[in-house]
């Protein structure tokens, strides 16, 4: 199994706009990080975890030519705002399986209303095949077994 961290930056990316901290001013290439997304390759399957706001740039940089599926961990902007950029893959290969939990699907339908309730197609819409996952209930993509875990993220209690 190969994991390719396409982005490991914060929600604003690194460097952050207008930030004068040591990291953001650094010339070290390790301090230039895109927002979070991971590419998993195993057994001939390619899975993307989260479509970050930087997904287009990440896909071009990593030469992503095909995806078997996308998994959405949660619907913070930095994890889903690249969803529209799967369209070129849809144009070539058709609809794509997207895996997310029920709460994420509610948010995705609200955030991307134009995909789920289209009024104007324009340059095309992302073509999704929705799959709802349940925490602690394994599912498979090809021969890859995945067990979604609930993680507290963002503001802690």
Predicted regions and their residues:
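Binuclear metal-dependent hydrolase catalytic cores
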Residues: 1-157
């Amino acid at each position: 199994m190969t994991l390719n961290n396409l982005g490991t930056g914060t929600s604003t990316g690194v460097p952050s706009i207008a930030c004068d901290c040591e990291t953001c001013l650094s010339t070290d290439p390790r301090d230039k990080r895109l927002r979070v997304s991971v590419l998993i390759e195993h057994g001939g399957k390619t899975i993307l975890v989260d479509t970050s706001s930087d997904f287009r740039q990440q896909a071009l940089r990593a030469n992503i030519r095909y995806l078997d599926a996308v998994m959405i961990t949660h619907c913070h902007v930095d994890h889903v705002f690249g969803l529209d950029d799967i369209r070129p893959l849809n144009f070539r290969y058709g609809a794509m399986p997207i895996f997310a939990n029920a709460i994420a699907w509610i948010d995705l339908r609200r955030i991307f209303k134009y995909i789920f309730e289209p009024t104007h197609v324009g340059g095309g819409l992302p073509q999704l095949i929705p799959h709802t996952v349940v925490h602690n209930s394994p599912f498979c993509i090809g021969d890859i077994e995945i067990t979604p875990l609930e993680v507290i993220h963002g503001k802690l209690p």
